[in-house]
């Protein structure tokens, strides 16, 4: 917010995603449908990271992996925003995995796999980490980035931990358990698709 004010754009709202009510977003409500769409979008993003980063270092034609990503990214966007889109969330998850699983790569080549971990913004935002994935790939490595949805699971597990070890109320524990089960259920189509693939490991 401070950065927006300094840039002369104080009217732009900053929406805080938090479950403990520390910040209120006036005029903005998280409806169940919006929350579900947001989780679907995160799952799509996690799938793209898992699939694209796995095959791009081994592509036979430079740029072909990114082209496939762009094609399926638009399909994923349409599934969330276009009522006329006939593909369901589960079908898009399967389509992404199957497309990248069939993508032609150099099967004889194996590169060192390098994990990217750390603070959430730096881990996922190329501008914040100086395009680390591209740097690693240019240096002959295969980048591995943990799923963003696991960060939310980690946050929810904190509710269970605080109840069990720090004396927090049972409400936080119950909400955490419901949240974890809900995320697992929404994520299941992606997990199932990854389990059936040749190249990819499920979370």
Ranges and model annotations:
Residues 1-203:
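An N-terminal assembly and electron-transfer interface module characteristic of large anaerobic redox
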């Amino acid at each position: 917010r401070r950065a927006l004010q300094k840039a002369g754009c104080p009217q732009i709202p900053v929406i805080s995603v938090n479950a403990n009510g520390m910040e209120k977003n006036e005029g903005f409500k998280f409806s169940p449908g919006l929350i579900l769409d947001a989780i679907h979008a995160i799952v799509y993003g996690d799938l793209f990271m898992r699939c694209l980063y796995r095959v791009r270092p081994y592509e036979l034609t430079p740029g072909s992996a990114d082209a496939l990503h762009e094609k399926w990214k638009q399909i994923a966007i349409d599934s969330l925003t276009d009522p006329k889109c006939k593909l369901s969330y589960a079908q898009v998850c399967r389509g992404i995995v199957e497309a990248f699983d069939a993508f032609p790569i150099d099967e004889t080549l194996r590169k060192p796999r390098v994990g990217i971990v750390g603070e959430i913004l730096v881990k996922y935002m190329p501008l914040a980490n100086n395009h680390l994935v591209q740097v690693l790939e240019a240096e002959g490595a295969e980048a591995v980035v943990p799923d963003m949805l696991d960060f939310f699971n980690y946050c929810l597990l904190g509710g269970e931990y605080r109840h069990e070890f720090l004396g927090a109320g049972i409400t936080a524990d119950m909400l955490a358990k419901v949240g974890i089960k809900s995320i697992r259920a929404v994520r299941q189509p992606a997990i199932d698709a990854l389990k059936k693939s040749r190249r990819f490991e499920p979370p």
